[in-house]
Amino acid sequence: MITSEDIRERGVPDFKPGDTIRVEYRVVEGNRERTQAFEGLCIARRGSGISQTFVVRKNSFGVDVERIFPLHSPKIAGIKVISRGAPRRAKLYYIREKVGRKARVKKAR
């Protein structure tokens, strides 16, 4: 069971939709465990408390990939903010229809 003390200890960085983040999560393959990175644009954050989730979108070899991560999952090894964005919306689902330069978010000052 995860307690509120465990949540504070994890030290989750402050990030918002529009920020480019790198999520390192643990993957179990057979009897081995390794860390895999997923770097992309955070397009949404939802929920509160222990059940918070966030959506990260990236382009991998010409294919757009979205992944939903539980914020306080023990599978997440770390979250790092690469750059800050300054969108005008809380949910950036409109990015799904955009391609190329139009799919970018303005950088924060």
Swiss-Prot record:
User: Single Gene Ontology BP term?
Assistant: translation
**Cross-referenced InterPro entries, in alphabetical order?**
Ribosomal_bL19 (IPR001857), Ribosomal_bL19_sf (IPR038657), Translation_prot_SH3-like_sf (IPR008991)
Entry keywords, A to Z:
Ribonucleoprotein, Ribosomal protein
A single Gene Ontology CC term: cytosolic large ribosomal subunit
Q: Which GO terms describe its molecular function?
A: structural constituent of ribosome
By its UniProt entry, which Gene3D superfamilies does this protein fall under?
A: 2.30.30.790
Where does the chain cross the membrane?
none
* Keyword presence, Membrane: no
Task: Supply the HAMAP family for this chain.
Answer: Ribosomal_bL19
| Functional summary from the UniProt entry | This protein is located at the 30S-50S ribosomal subunit interface and may play a role in the structure and function of the aminoacyl-tRNA binding site.
The family this protein is said to belong to? Belongs to the bacterial ribosomal protein bL19 family.
Any idea what this protein is called?
A: Large ribosomal subunit protein bL19
Organism equals Rubrobacter xylanophilus (strain DSM 9941 / JCM 11954 / NBRC 16129 / PRD-1)
Q: What is the name of the gene encoding this protein?
A: rplS
